[in-house]
């Protein structure tokens, strides 16, 4: 497993930000993404990623030696659309599991009732300065360019997510497979409501 910024000491997890300079750059990217977003996004609880910063991974040893690349979370300064598209140069099969809506919107992670992702985003209700060519539309265009250069298969953990992908103007034509998240059925199992409240 390769991560952008590592928490903990698990030896099976490779940190892409090992070393003082790489760590500083990762923290800078993460903080810059968050603070710049505050300039453009209304004071709401809905997360919005600009994805202006990123890291090139095409020279990474682990990725070069990998049989397959499985992406999960690529935001907070990790993979901007430009660096995401570069992964195609590694000539590896790529699978991307979506855990929220960001990959197929102009920046929001949770779209609630907004349906602008059906038509190239723009006029984003989350932005302070919205309009037809606002940041959400520009982000959408960056993602469209990147996705046109990158071959990947989408995994959705729910039918709802798969249907959302199919409805999106960015990825509606991509193959999507539903693979539900796994859970410990010994721990998470149906209980009688009254009994569950006692636990």
Where are these regions (language model features)?
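A short, histidine- and acid-enriched strand-loop-helix "catalytic/donor-clamping" loop
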Residues: 73-78, 98-109, 124-132, 162
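N-terminal strand-loop element at the rim of the active site
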Residues: 1-52, 57-60
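Short aromatic-enriched loop/helix-cap "lid" or pocket-rim segments at secondary-structure transitions
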Residues: 11-17, 83, 106-111, 116, ...
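Generic beta-sheet signal
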Residues: 4, 97-98, 157, 179
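Carbohydrate-associated surface elements
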Residues: 160, 182
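Short N-terminal targeting/anchoring amphipathic segment
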Residues: 58-79, 92-99
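A short helix/loop element that forms part of the nucleotide-sugar donor recognition site in Leloir-type
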Residues: 139-143, 189-199
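Membrane-proximal helix-turn-helix segments that form the acceptor-binding/catalytic region
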Residues: 85, 89, 102, 114-155, ...
């Amino acid at each position: 497993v390769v991560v952008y910024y590592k928490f903990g000491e698990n030896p099976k997890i490779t940190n892409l930000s090992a070393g003082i300079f790489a760590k500083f750059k990762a923290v800078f990217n993460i903080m810059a993404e968050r603070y710049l977003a505050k300039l453009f996004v209304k004071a709401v609880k809905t997360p919005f990623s600009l994805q202006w910063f990123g890291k090139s991974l095409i020279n990474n040893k682990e990725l070069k030696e990998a049989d397959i690349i499985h992406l999960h979370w690529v935001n907070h300064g990790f993979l901007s659309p430009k660096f995401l598209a570069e992964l195609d140069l590694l000539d590896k099969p790529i699978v991307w599991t979506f855990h929220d809506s960001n990959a197929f919107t102009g920046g929001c992670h949770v779209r609630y009732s907004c349906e602008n992702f059906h038509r190239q985003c723009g006029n984003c209700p989350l932005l302070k300065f919205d309009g037809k060519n606002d940041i959400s539309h520009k982000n959408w265009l960056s993602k469209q360019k990147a996705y046109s250069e990158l071959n990947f298969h989408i995994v959705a953990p729910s039918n709802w997510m798969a249907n959302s992908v199919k409805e999106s103007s960015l990825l509606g034509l991509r193959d999507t497979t539903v693979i539900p998240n796994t859970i410990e059925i010994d721990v998470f199992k149906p209980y009688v409501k009254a009994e569950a409240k006692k636990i």
